[in-house]
Regions:
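Internal helix-turn-beta structural module
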Residues: 10, 300-356
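Glycine-rich, N-terminal phosphate-binding loop and its surrounding beta-alpha-beta segment
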Residues: 44-103, 107-109
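A short glycine/serine-rich beta->alpha loop
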Residues: 10-15, 118-130, 215-219, 276-279, ...
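Short acidic, glycine/tyrosine-flanked loop/strand segments centered on an H-E-D-like triad
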Residues: 98-124, 306-324
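N-terminal, positively charged regions that mediate nucleic acid binding
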Residues: 1-58
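Alpha-helical support elements that line or immediately flank enzyme active sites
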Residues: 20-32, 128-150, 223-231, 287-297, ...
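Glycine-rich, mobile lid/loop segments that gate access to catalytic sites or pores
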Residues: 113-221
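Glycine-rich anion/phosphate-binding loop at the beta-strand->alpha-helix junction
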Residues: 14, 20, 199-202, 206-315
Length: 356
């Protein structure tokens, strides 16, 4: 399985949704970086399940056990390994998946890829549960980046077609349900509640902005900043699309409208607009990096759906049991921040080496 990411940071995710523990090993974090464990736990709590009405009923503390790489609160240069114990699993809910794959899940493709040897319980290694160890590394990267003057802020841009209003600002940082318009937020929550009541689910879009990233991060072609961020973000289950800056909207603009005019502000080169999302030619230009990620509705729903019995090759109806989110978007916000932080810090380390 491809569970490793990074050029300077090398992180490997391990475990399954219902295994005794899930975890991560990361190499490449320089020695001497201060890790605030309380701040890290607060970040992980934003992703943790079972804490609100729009989340799965599965309750997990998501308290990380750091086994190596940290001494007296500082990174020591050795590989950092951390685990999170799985304490609230119900594998019996997935007994029927051995022969009947769930629509919208990786059950069928995993069956083909791994000849039936994959762990099916809770989605195994394909589960969104595996975003928790990624958030450990992302949370640490966020702390390091903040000390370098680089901050990340995200919001729920839309849920079930209900779009937030206003501009993304730092005031939303760390909020459980980060939206600008309280009225639109209530509409989103109501849409989630209605989907849950109907045994269904809804998706949405998360917008993320990275402030303070210096010009010069990233490379042309395959090492571009968009490539790095997209690769990390697509590692989050349920992500089906990503766009930077004005995104697909640029296709309807003229060049004179899309081009971000350069100017000088306080002795620094800036652009008057930011249609490019802070990236030109794969390299950051010093403006905020802005992107949006689209999340599909949670595929585990209680409504009856059609599948196929893989033993008899006969179509049959099924309804998914177990505990699942009617909307994954609110809990996915810190996952997007973690992915972006890892990608940006990895590129930041590359730039530091280039400038030596």
């Amino acid at each position: 399985m491809s569970s490793t990411y990074g050029e300077n940071l090398h992180l490997t995710i391990f475990g399954q949704s219902h295994s005794p523990a899930i975890g991560v090993t990361v190499e490449g974090i320089p020695a001497g970086e201060d890790v605030d464990r309380d701040e890290l736990q607060r970040f992980l709590d934003r992703r943790a399940p079972g804490k609100n009405v729009w989340s799965t009923p599965r309750k997990e503390a998501d308290a990380p056990e750091i086994l190596s790489g940290l001494v007296n609160g500082y990174t020591c240069g050795a590989p950092l390994t951390a685990i999170i114990r799985n304490t609230n699993t119900r594998s019996q809910d997935y007994a029927n998946l051995a022969v009947t794959p769930r629509p919208g899940h990786a059950d069928y493709t995993a069956e083909v890829k791994y000849d039936g040897y994959q762990d099916r319980a809770g989605g195994g290694h394909f589960s969104g549960r595996l975003t928790a160890p990624r958030c450990i590394v992302g949370g640490i990267c966020l702390q390091i980046l903040a000390r370098e003057g680089i901050t990340l802020v995200s919001r729920i841009a839309s849920i079930a077609g209900i779009t937030d209003e206003g501009e993304l600002t730092g005031s939303l940082a760390g909020k459980e349900f980060p939206i600008v318009s309280d009225a639109r937020g209530e509409e989103m929550r109501e849409a989630i509640a209605q989907a849950r009541e109907a045994g269904d689910s809804v998706g949405g879009v998360i917008e993320c902005a990275i402030f303070g990233a210096p010009a010069g991060l990233g490379d042309p072609m395959f090492g571009g900043m968009e490539n790095r961020i997209a690769s990390a973000v697509f590692g989050i289950p349920a992500v089906k699309g990503i766009e930077f800056g004005a995104g697909f909207g640029v296709a309807s603009l003229r060049g004179s409208e899309d081009n971000d005019a350069f100017t000088v502000e306080n002795g620094k080169i800036v652009t008057e607009t930011n249609h490019c999302g802070g990236i030109l030619g794969g390299i950051t230009n010093g403006m905020p990096i802005v992107f949006r990620a689209a999340f599909k509705p949670t595929p585990s729903i209680a409504r009856e759906q059609q599948s196929v019995n893989l033993q008899t090759m006969v179509p049959e109806k099924m309804a998914v049991t177990g505990r699942h989110d009617p909307c994954i978007v609110p809990r996915a916000v810190p996952c997007v921040e973690a992915a972006a932080a890892i990608a940006v810090y990895d590129a930041y380390l590359s730039r530091k080496r280039e400038m030596r």
